[in-house]
Amino acid sequence: MAKLHHLGFPRIGNKRQLKFALEKFWGGELSEQQLQTSAADLRQQNWLDQQDLALDLYTVGDFSLYDQVLDMSFLVGNIPSRAKQSEQDNSLDNYFRVARGRSQPQECCAASHGQSGESQAGEMTKWFNTNYHYIVPEFDAQTTFLLNAKQLLLQIEALQKINKNVKPVIIGPVTYLWLGKEKDNSQKLTLLPELLEVYAELLALFAEKNITWVQIDEPILVLEIPKQWQEALQSSYQKLGQSKVKLLLTTYFGELKNNLKLACELPIAGLHLDAVNAPHEIDSAIDYLGTDKILSLGIINACNIWKTDLNQTLNQLLPIHQKLQDRLWLAPSSSLLHVPIDLNNEDKLDYEVKSWLAFAVQKLQELSLIGRALNDGLSSVEAAFTYNKLCIENRRQSPQVHKQDIKSKVLNITPELGQRNLAIKQREALQQSYLNLPSYPTTTIGSFPQTSDIRQLRQAKRLGDINEEQYKKSIKESIEFCINEQDQLGLDVLVHGEAERNDMVEYFGELLDGFVFTQFAWVQSYGSRCVKPPILFGDVSRPKAMTVEWSSYAQSLTEKKVKGMLTGPVTILNWSFVRDDQPLQTTCMQIALAIREEVLDLEKAGINIIQIDEAALREKLPLHRSQWQQYLNWAIAAFRLCANGVNDKTQIHTHMCYSEFNDIIAAIAQMDADVITIETSRSDMVLLDVFEAFSYPNGIGPGVYDIHSPNIPDVEQMVSLMKKAALRIPAEQLWVNPDCGLKTRRWEEVKPALLNMVAAAKKLRAS
């Protein structure tokens, strides 16, 4: 009998209950006890919802109030000293201080009276090749570890009251160290022996709780890791494999390649493979695992929202099941954290498109159906399999998906469409003469605070409570307010503020053909930040201009230059749930053609600085470096396609966030944007080290303060950061800007922060 389980379930709640509870807690409207009660209710509901799915093991430890890597840091007692403001190291105050630089608003008052209420937030970066972000663990020569498993053990006890077959999930010790960053010249692998003692202690506590199986995630096995890290995995599991619990080593997000034999031969009880992305490794894994170990196959794609082809998957599994019998386990490919919770909440979605989709609940239902087909025979689920086959075939042939005229446009793309007339230095001189900007020009990344009034306005429009004319009037009032505020703050290049946009990708998807939208298909990006990605289901085109009206109006209000604000094709692709029936490259070029039309229309309307955000350029880099160049070739080509065709005096900007780009700097230079703004403040400008060896010819704005933290940046701190930047990049190429958009901040935070930023720029000009 094949056993069924999952690697993790979404934690935010089907109506984003966790987000709202967190924000109330941070705002002082909810006590710590009330927050913990809300969290417990969410966990309980998740477990109850899974009871009808015939799972053999129930997962615990997949829930987090902010981030599972941060949870692991607190579980093993690795807490930065700057965050230890509470006597209890594992307090929520300390936890949120690491996550966001501050816990609750009263700390702001403490800080203003000279107390240490604020601290620098932990660095945040992408979780492998997903749109989830984790708080980077910090290590130094003084790092020690101390187990504090109280919260996790309480969760285990709560789940055991519902079902005794409990499987805790933890991040493996080697992956945990790999994900972290040394803050000095120490070597983090030297910390492994002490860390393993804490893990061994934790596994012993699990055994005392009558736990049989523990899921231990080591996703670095899908990377090309150095030999010493392979050896670290071997030594780690030689020790941990001696515990009284059985270890299910889990990998996800791709193939193991050279690490496959290593993983299979570790002293573990079972191995989970991503069978969606690496089905070709199954036979070798069976051979390497021997006759005693469990093989868990991730057969349901946990990173997209398309229905699984149940018949095809069953046919793939039948010979494997015959060979392994009860040594075969089935699960989604990774944690379901990366997909929305329940498709049944969507009652306004196009019926045909909806029939092609599966969210987290539906994916577990698919898993259950496949398990029943294997264990009880196809006849037990024949009706469900027949319906699934009809849906798969309908999608394959739907005229909603396939548009021949768009496919023809992509086939006719030529290299010349991605070329500017003049080289960067010639364009730079032309643009400086035309734009007449000061040294260290100041700007923002695009969005300004989304107040409750703005959100209510958009909701009123959606509900039909106001007409189009009323909506436009209010948006223009918001734009006017935003322009006036920027003028008063003394910024050099302004933006219209994006009041009309609920999300930088969703906004464009709503105006492009080939997308559909949901009401409740939220996924967690980080902490309380949730996104609702559009569903890119068909060929993409632009029916009409999308931003020209708003940017033109903003420009009419000021003598200063206003940037047009667009989202780039690679980011739209990477931050959407994308069709899987054609190459990503083809879909990306369709989007690029649509954005190119918008760029040209903005220029015709008198907008001569146009920012095309590629915040997610790096996000879909293959996990194996040997495959990077193929991705970068078409990603850079897509950007160049949409960014060119304009006059050389028109200045093209782009923005990248959460990006460690040192290893792709040559590709970024090939984008040939006139100015790039990047997120560097949390890394203390360390990201700029690459420019010591690489002569980057274009303008660059290294973010001088962290917008993800509510802390107000200090003038001298920003001056210091820019001086560090000027050691690596010629001062005449530098811009001064925040590291990301200001949408999630409040005006009372934004105004003093930008005022200080402008003051820093003026001080730099005078120095």
Curated annotation (Swiss-Prot):
CDD domains reported for this sequence: CIMS_C_terminal_like (cd03311), CIMS_N_terminal_like (cd03312)
Cofactor(s), by name: Zn(2+)
Chain residues that bind 5-methyltetrahydropteroyltri-L-glutamate: 126, 529-530, 575, 619
UniProt-recorded Gene Ontology molecular function terms: 5-methyltetrahydropteroyltriglutamate-homocysteine S-methyltransferase activity; zinc ion binding
Binding site for Zn(2+): 655, 657, 679, 740
Reaction catalysis annotation: 5-methyltetrahydropteroyltri-L-glutamate + L-homocysteine = tetrahydropteroyltri-L-glutamate + L-methionine
Record: residues binding L-homocysteine: 445-447, 498, 613
Enzyme class: transferase
Entry-linked SUPFAM superfamilies: UROD/MetE-like
Cross-referenced InterPro entries: Cbl-indep_Met_Synth_N, Cobalamin-indep_Met_synthase, Met_Synth_C/arc, UROD/MetE-like_sf
EC number: 2.1.1.14
CC cofactor note: Binds 1 zinc ion per subunit.
One of the GO BP terms on file: methionine biosynthetic process
Binding positions (L-methionine): 445-447, 498, 613
Active-site residues (renumbered): 708
Pfam families membership: Meth_synt_1, Meth_synt_2
Organism superkingdom: Bacteria
UniProt pathway annotation: Amino-acid biosynthesis; L-methionine biosynthesis via de novo pathway; L-methionine from L-homocysteine (MetE route): step 1/1
Keywords: Amino-acid biosynthesis, Metal-binding, Methionine biosynthesis, Methyltransferase, Repeat, Transferase, Zinc
Its biological purpose: Catalyzes the transfer of a methyl group from 5-methyltetrahydrofolate to homocysteine resulting in methionine formation.
Family per similarity comment: Belongs to the vitamin-B12 independent methionine synthase family.
Protein name per Swiss-Prot or TrEMBL: 5-methyltetrahydropteroyltriglutamate--homocysteine methyltransferase
